[in-house]
Swiss-Prot record:
UniProt-recorded name of the protein: Cytochrome b
Record organism: Numida meleagris
PROSITE patterns tied to this protein: CYTB_CTER, CYTB_NTER
PANTHER family from the UniProt entry: CYTOCHROME B
Function as written in the Swiss-Prot or TrEMBL entry: Component of the ubiquinol-cytochrome c reductase complex (complex III or cytochrome b-c1 complex) that is part of the mitochondrial respiratory chain. The b-c1 complex mediates electron transfer from ubiquinol to cytochrome c. Contributes to the generation of a proton gradient across the mitochondrial membrane that is then used for ATP synthesis.
Length: 380
């Protein structure tokens, strides 16, 4: 019999083993769609970003007008920019849901896959941050100033570090040029880490909603999950296109329509919505270094999750108390997101502090406690 090129060709063989003949659990739900959705978001961002970079000028006197020029004079430039800006929002929606799925179903017990995922999240956050600075509007400039300034809280080397990052004594032209370079570079770093992420995942195979071995019941990825992924894709692209075409500025800040001015501070400096939860935690601590540490901890705490798993069951499918706690954590994060968008005044300060405290308490103390309690309940 003639050899099947799909299974013998060195390159096609890799694609076949990853996307076609990949043995997949037969019972994974729509929560397992977000990996492929993230891949699609990523490719969309790379393509639109490349097209935008062709028309962008990384200079403080030209950046703002070059973005305006792209939207006004380049064929479909407005669409490319709107897809890129809102595509970032959908990227974060997908990654947060992907992480939430991992938390709920105990996927974090694949430690290498989980840890590379956390590194991916951090790299994505860095990419989004430097990208937001590029249009050089008011919020771009002041966001860059506030966030880079946080590094000055690091003892002894802080101030030197900040001036080194800025390329001067304030956010200026050198900062913008290096941020553009970083915004171009980091997506390729993300692509590399993604391949590592998938390599680790394919070592163990996918988890499933029951959290038990699915070796006895595997089905090929194609056509079953390829068609399921296409459904997920249409369900994501529809709202993305709707947003980009009908209300492209809904998630942006009106302040960014004003060119950057170092002499005028906006009344409320706040990041894009997907960073608000971390921003709220940062603002909840009245000490600069403490705030920076809490900000870092809010994301890095994910690295501790595998070590805080005390339950005998992997997933939360049959653990109602853990489920309740999980959804309380989700509500808590939504409250933090809302508080982060509000001015620093009563009652938002105290709400933010309570929500920050309950965020860390839930993850570090309550989840392990409830897991242990549920283990005891299994014996009765």
């Amino acid at each position: 019999m003639a050899p099947n090129i799909r299974k013998s060709h060195p390159l096609l063989k890799m694609i076949n083993n990853s996307l076609i003949d990949l043995p997949t659990p037969s019972n994974i739900s729509a929560w397992w769609n977000f990996g492929s959705l993230l891949a699609v978001c990523f490719m969309t961002q790379i393509i639109t970003g490349l097209l935008l970079a062709m028309h962008y000028t990384a200079d403080t006197s030209l950046a703002f007008s070059s973005v305006a020029h792209t939207c006004r004079n380049v064929q479909y430039g407005w669409l490319i920019r709107n897809l890129h800006a809102n595509g970032a929002s959908f990227f974060f929606i997908c990654i947060y849901l992907h992480i939430g799925r991992g938390l709920y179903y105990g996927s974090y017990l694949y430690k290498e896959t989980w840890n590379t995922g956390v590194i991916l999240l951090l790299t994505l956050m860095a990419t989004a941050f430097v990208g937001y600075v590029l249009p050089w509007g008011q919020m771009s400039f002041w966001g860059a100033t506030v966030i880079t300034n946080l590094f000055s809280a690091i003892p002894y080397i802080g101030q030197t570090l900040v001036e080194w990052a800025w390329g001067g004594f304030s956010v200026d032209n050198p900062t913008l040029t290096r941020f553009f370079a970083l915004h171009f570079l980091l997506p390729f770093v993300i692509a590399g880490i993604t391949i590592i992420h998938l390599t680790f995942l394919h070592e163990s195979g996918s988890n499933n909603p029951l959290g038990i071995s699915s070796n006895s019941d595997k089905i090929p990825f194609h056509p079953y999950y390829s068609i399921k992924d296409i459904l997920g894709l249409t369900l994501m692209l529809t709202p993305l296109l709707t947003l980009a075409l009908f209300s492209p500025n809904l998630l942006g800040d009106p302040e960014n329509f004003t060119p950057a001015n170092p002499l005028v501070t906006p009344p409320h400096i706040k990041p894009e919505w997907y960073f608000l939860f971390a921003y709220a935690i940062l603002r909840s601590i009245p000490n600069k270094l403490g705030g920076v540490l809490a900000l870092a901890a809010s994301v890095l705490i994910l690295l501790l999750i595998p070590f805080l798993h005390k339950s005998k069951q992997r997933t939360m499918t049959f653990r109602p108390f853990s489920q309740l706690l999980f959804w309380l954590l989700v509500a808590n994060l939504l409250i933090l997101t809302w508080v982060g968008s509000q001015p620093v005044e009563h009652p938002f300060i105290i709400i933010g502090q309570l929500a920050s405290l309950s965020y860390f308490t839930t993850l570090l103390i309550l989840f392990p406690m409830i897991g242990t309690l549920e283990n005891k309940m299994l014996n009765h």
